[in-house]
Amino acid sequence: MLKKIGNDLSFFTGYLTFRTYDSIWRKATLPMYSKLKENLRKPTKTCLPQNDLDYRLRHTLIRQNARHYQSIKNTFINIPTFELNTFLKKEFHSNIILASPTLSFSILDYLNDGRIINSDKDIRKIVKKFRLIDSMTRLTDYNAYQLNPAIDILKILDDNTRNKLLGLFDDAIFYSLDIESFVTNFSDKKYYFQDCEAINKQFNYDVYGLYVPYDDNGKKRLQIETIILVDRRTDNTKTYVFQSNFSQWEIIRNNYINWTRTMSSVYEHQLGSNVYCQNTLYHMRKTLAKTHPITVLMKPFMEGVYFTNKVFTSFGISIADTENEVVNRYMDRVELFDLSNQTMIQALEYIHKTDGYKLLDYKKVYHENGVDDIYFEQKQLLEDLYQIVFDLVTNVFEYYYQSTDDYVKDNELRDFYLSIKNDLTFVEDLQQKDNAIKFFSNIIFLSSIRHSKNHINYAYLNSFYDYALRKTNFDLLLDKLDNGIPFDEKDCLSTVGDFYSKYSSGIYPSVPINLFGTGYKNLFADNEVQKFFTDVTNKLNQLKKNTERNNYTEFLFRLQNSNTI
């Protein structure tokens, strides 16, 4: 079964087992579909030269044998400003749905009406029609994330700051011109505050959540008590305060949890923390022999990264199509084994300019945010996983380097450190063995194990863009509230009923956000989804039991399988 799923789906579709030959997609025919499929399925040439005697020769060979892709210029006009070219090729590259079925049907209808894409004007029309986000906007509008490190997602407010934001009111919903007009005394409770900046910049909302600790059978947890939403879509700003006694609290809460989950994922990707694995591989290829123990140690995790590139190759996406898109500076879409690839150079130049490295030491993130004593399952699970990774790396180092002299005399590892330290400026002196153990443990855990588990095994395609496109936001709720019309769960989730989005809404178990996600099982009143969540939970529980295994290598290999967890 796992093999079938792996063959049927791309690396990031996870549980999205939706085959087009089982759907009405199969019945829809496009005038240009055959030509597209023919062009996109032309074979590509992949060459991975490796010469362990001279890494400079290896670099030369790689440059000479760079990947060659078939051009599809006759099908699409390459417009670097937009990602639509890439998006459409994903849509039509084979009989597998890789993007939103809802949006896919819309584009199918659009093309079936005889509208052939052959110019800049046509592409811009589709961008406008389907509200697609272009690359340049994506970079410029959201570049502000870099100014707010991911560790600031969760802030603990002092009394003075808290009093400036909002107050407690008898009414469930309160209207005001500005949230700053709310001033009150929050008693002695310790509140945890989360601000959805990702929503602010795109939709003209300010969204805030206040959490308060509670005791759960001796374990300290957090529960959300108040959600504040400032609607800035018009000149007359309105502020809505939703509290737990609000009659439709669960609906508001579930929408908010969706946003916090997707926002946290966006923060991590904007900070480039998931690119550190690629960066490490880049320098390993230049300095470490294929038989070097560190290469052997890192290989299973790097192979998972290479699988990413194989999938993108299967899309028919070439370097020429995407290397000029600025957005690729912080996306995983890098050709890792081509050292001359411009996309890789952009990634190397970008990631060390952010604070993403702080996420490598996620325990420190917890400590700095004062949530060490808060209990939630994913935190404990990932701590167990990290310890396994750390023990594995430690044992490899201790076994291979029997003495300090053995370690100091490893010229290849020294060259690796000298090569990487200018790109990853936060890297401590790897000439100290303890620093090297921690560095490789963090790279394996954050950039491979945790990133793979959080995204590959769930729903990589999910982002807050999807919630805008699917109307899974507060627009409908606010409009109905303004007009005194009751709303229900169907109103909020009517556009997330398709197979893709209901499986990808709110199932990110990443470290910064499972602090808030204890109610995800009740996100949808859908038996199929409930069963899916139950299966995931059971697998996670089984995985937690497996952390006691001693066969680390086998266990970590299993984590590389996109359908294991």
Curated annotation (Swiss-Prot):
It comes from the Viruses. InterPro entries: LipOase_C_sf. SUPFAM superfamilies: Lipoxigenase. This is Uncharacterized protein L64. It comes from Acanthamoeba polyphaga mimivirus.
